[in-house]
Amino acid sequence: SLLVTCSRNRLNFPMGTQLISQESISWQKLAPFLDGPIRVRLSPGAKNSIRESNKVLKQILKTKRKVYGVNTGFGKLGNVSISVKDLKQLQLNLVRSHSCGIGKPLDLGVTRLMLVLKLMTYAKGYSGVRPKVAQLLVDMLNHDILPIIPRKGSVGASGDLAPLAHMARGMIGEGDVHFQDRIVPAMIALKESNLNPIVLEAKEGLSLINGTQVSVALGIRSLAEAYILLKTADISGAL
């Protein structure tokens, strides 16, 4: 209806480039991503925190200490050690195996906000991913390259595993994305934007699919629409 589809930008939500730092961002500043692309950039502090967390991960790998999801299997296979030569394949297999969603795609606005929320998580500096993983999220947002993500099938045990796996597929150049008003293979959209897909390294597949970014994006959309309804009710009551 008109009440829930009218532009949230008319509620005086801020526009322009959104800075992603280690600080939290209010839902009012995030809701405009539901309506269309907004440029983003990482703060110097966020970039540094991402670099430092990646250094910690590299040190762990050098010590050969067994760390779950980094150099072990997952779930019941958590005690199984994975050799260094197989770490990349482990992360790739994780993403592919969890890309099992079904049904109609998520709304583009929800997908866009989902990417922003994942970027915000990385900006905190706790994930261990390489800076290029976070930068690809920035570039995909700024080119509005949005992975096609089925809305059903999330496991929910460790967050929104299935939908986030579909997001990760777009980042590795697999699956389809929405780009320039068309649905194309992810590799084509990346190539046309002069971007390269990432090759997942230790822990990166796990860090991409673990999280509640889809649930939070849907929650923000519900909150924004409730705000519109509340303001509309206030106006109607004043007539």
Segments and roles (model prediction):
Residues 15-239:
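Conserved, well-structured ligand/cofactor-binding cores
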Residues 9-12:
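Intrinsic-disorder-associated, low-complexity terminal segments enriched in Asp/Asn/His/Tyr and depleted
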